[in-house]
């Protein structure tokens, strides 16, 4: 079991510990549970899916990186597949607060990067802030997305974000988590560059068309990729570096041990991720950063 889970796991009910043990003990536990694993756990513990999601929140919050706030938030995203994806807030010392990742953003992006086509619900241990409500409004599940909080009746994103402004107001029909392939091509031989380009091809940037992707190489050679997730309200957009850091963190790797990074983005786009990517990675101790353009 990854050390970060030990305290929270020890505080779970004994029946849930027993049901989870074999999954969470796996050295490659991906901070998610597949639908068949969820079914096995709920049947063994006598929980319904919602009760299980609430019970898992302390484990999700254990993935939090909060050196600035010391405020640990966990979120569980339920995919239409029935899979459950952990998410947590992530802060980076030495980087501006604008680079912070909220727990809901983390869970949503985690699901997206794992190939989940749409979400059914988000369970979180604190009320979603306005930033996260707007971020989730970009999803293909729209305002019907279920939001569940401890001690409250289930509600929809539409209840939390009435009279919302979103992609449809800008005549955007391709939404976040829709499967896309933008078809950008380069003659590449470097595997990390290929991974960054592949991520850019699956990014969501309908407002700027500045599609971008990042690939990070960990010290052991594992590669984590992230895609740009643009938002109709612009500011809640999630940069591709943050998406890659999400996958790195939930996978149990150390975001301060990035060996090498590659950004892929257009040569002449109206905006660039380059400066922010380099600056944030520098704050994390990585200087080996390169850029490829298409």
UniProtKB/Swiss-Prot annotation:
Gene Ontology MF terms: cytidine deaminase activity; identical protein binding; zinc ion binding
Residues bound to Zn(2+): 102, 129, 132
Bilayer-crossing regions: none
CDD domains assigned: cytidine_deaminase (cd01283)
Cofactor: binding details: Binds 1 zinc ion.
GO terms of biological process kind: cytidine deamination
Positions of substrate binding: 89-91
The entry's keywords: Hydrolase, Metal-binding, Zinc
Enzyme Commission (EC) number: 3.5.4.5
Enzyme class: hydrolase
Reactions listed under catalytic activity: cytidine + H2O + H(+) = uridine + NH4(+); 2'-deoxycytidine + H2O + H(+) = 2'-deoxyuridine + NH4(+)
Domain of life of the source: Bacteria
Gene Ontology CC: cytosol
A Pfam short name: dCMP_cyt_deam_2
Residue ranges of domain CMP/dCMP-type deaminase in the record: 48-168, 187-294
Presence of the UniProt keyword Glycosyltransferase in the record: no
Active site: 104 (proton donor)
Cofactor: Zn(2+)
PANTHER family named in the record: CYTIDINE DEAMINASE
Function noted in UniProt: This enzyme scavenges exogenous and endogenous cytidine and 2'-deoxycytidine for UMP synthesis.
Similarity annotation: Belongs to the cytidine and deoxycytidylate deaminase family.
Subunit structure: Homodimer.
Entry protein name: Cytidine deaminase
Organism: Serratia proteamaculans (strain 568)
């Amino acid at each position: 079991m990854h050390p970060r889970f030990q305290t929270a796991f020890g505080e779970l009910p004994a029946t849930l510990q027993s049901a989870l043990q074999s999954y969470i003990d796996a050295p490659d536990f991906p901070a998610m549970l597949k639908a068949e694993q969820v079914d096995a756990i709920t049947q063994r513990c006598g929980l319904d899916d919602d009760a299980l999601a609430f019970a898992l929140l302390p484990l999700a919050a254990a993935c939090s990186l909060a050196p600035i706030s010391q405020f640990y938030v966990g979120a569980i995203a339920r995919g239409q597949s029935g899979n459950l994806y952990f998410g947590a807030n992530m802060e980076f010392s030495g980087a501006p607060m604008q680079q912070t990742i909220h727990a809901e953003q983390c869970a949503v992006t985690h699901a997206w990067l794992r190939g989940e086509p749409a979400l059914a619900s988000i369970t979180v241990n604190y009320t979603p802030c306005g930033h996260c409500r707007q971020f989730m409004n970009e999803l293909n599940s729209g305002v019907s997305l279920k939001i569940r909080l401890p001690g409250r009746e289930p509600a929809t994103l539409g209840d939390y974000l009435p009279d919302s402004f979103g992609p449809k107001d800008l005549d955007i029909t391709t939404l976040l988590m829709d499967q896309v392939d933008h078809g950008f091509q380069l003659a590449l031989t470097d595997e990390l560059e290929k991974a960054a380009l592949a991520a850019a091809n699956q990014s969501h940037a309908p407002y700027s068309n500045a599609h971008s992707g990042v690939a990070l190489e960990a010290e052991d050679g594992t590669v984590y990729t992230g895609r740009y997730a643009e938002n109709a309200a612009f500011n809640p957009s999630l940069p591709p570096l943050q998406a890659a850091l999400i996958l790195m963190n939930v996978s149990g790797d150390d975001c301060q041990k990035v060996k090498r990074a590659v950004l892929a983005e257009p040569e002449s786009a109206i905006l660039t991720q380059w400066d922010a990517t380099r600056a944030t990675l520098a704050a994390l101790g990585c200087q080996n950063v390169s850029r490829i353009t298409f």
